Design a protein with these regions (language model features):
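N-terminal domain-start interaction segment
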Residues: 3-6, 11-17, 24-26, 31, ...
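Long, charged/polar, surface-exposed segments that mediate recognition or autoinhibition
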Residues: 120-132
Length: 133
């Protein structure tokens, strides 16, 4: 998987988390994403949706988790309410250069990602509110 694929919050359910990394992730929201996938694969879409709504009700998750939850709900036939559909969780900008493409993503949770055309990148995490001023 290309790291850029992780920026948009629109991966298919079998890639969030990747099957190969399930043993490496623990806690929420990962456990709920995995349970939702298992329910959906087993044909129990109502329980799958329930898990995803539980994720949406969790506080202080990365914006990308909320985006993924809505992506999965849409694949299960559920659309967000109008006010939620307009909620902006982040912005991804791709800039084409002669040398390649630079990509920057900024999210509502004050995190950001940057990939330079050279392949170098930056992951900006925001551990506290000290930079909000």
């Amino acid at each position: 998987m290309d790291i850029r694929d992780l920026f948009f919050g629109d991966l298919p359910a079998d890639r969030w988390p990747e099957q190969s990394s399930i043993k490496e992730v623990s806690g929420e929201p990962w456990e709920s994403f995995i349970k939702s996938r298992e329910f959906s694969t087993g044909g129990d879409n109502q329980s799958a949706k329930q898990c995803l709504h539980e994720i949406l009700s969790m506080n202080n998750l990365e914006s990308r988790h909320y985006l993924q939850a809505w992506t999965f709900l849409r694949t299960l036939g559920e659309q967000p309410p109008a006010d939620e559909a307009k909620h902006l969780y982040g912005v991804v900008i791709e800039v084409a250069l002669d040398e390649g493409v630079d990509v920057v993503a900024a999210y509502q949770d004050h995190t950001a990602r940057y990939i330079n055309h050279s392949g170098a990148g930056v992951v900006w995490e925001h551990p506290n509110d000290s930079l909000n001023e």
